[in-house]
């Protein structure tokens, strides 16, 4: 049976979901500005070569997000226009929530969500997983790149 999550529980179970990923991790959020704790957890998944897919919907990624993502070889990013869904899942659990992967939201907003455990509610988990896969399919995979431009022209 699904479990209701308030703001603090949503943040807690999101961290647990990321930590618990053994094979794959899908993070779907319109806004993407990761806090240091989430980055640390994702870096660990990257080191373990876990397949991580992040789908976001607002194209204005900050330069520090771009640099960080470029350094993570097992984290793939996709852009999905008109994305409003927020869904986070691994092979065992899914969270459907109002919480964006946005540092401000995780600290300042009142959020809620639902935790779905595959073992407890296989059909609901399957439906959530399939919709997440559909969103991934309609998204454009983005190869993160950023070119540094010198603030002054170099003289020759």
Can you annotate each of these PLM segments?
Residues 1-156:
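PLD/PLD-like phosphodiesterase catalytic module centered on the HKD motif
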């Amino acid at each position: 049976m699904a479990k209701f999550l308030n703001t603090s529980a949503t943040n807690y179970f999101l961290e647990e979901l990321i930590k618990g990923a053994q094979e794959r991790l899908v993070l779907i959020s319109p806004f993407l500005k990761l806090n240091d704790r989430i980055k640390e957890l994702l870096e660990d998944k990257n080191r373990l070569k876990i397949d991580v897919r992040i789908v976001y919907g607002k194209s204005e990624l900050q330069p520090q997000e771009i640099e960080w993502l470029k350094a993570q070889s097992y984290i793939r990013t996709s852009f999905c226009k008109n994305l409003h869904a927020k869904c986070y899942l691994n092979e065992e659990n899914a969270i459907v929530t109002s919480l964006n992967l946005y540092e401000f939201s995780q600290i300042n907003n009142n959020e809620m969500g639902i935790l779905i455990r595959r073992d407890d509610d296989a059909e609901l988990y399957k439906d959530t997983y399939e919709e997440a896969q559909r969103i991934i399919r309609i998204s454009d995979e983005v190869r993160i790149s950023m070119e540094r431009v010198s603030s002054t022209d170099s003289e020759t």
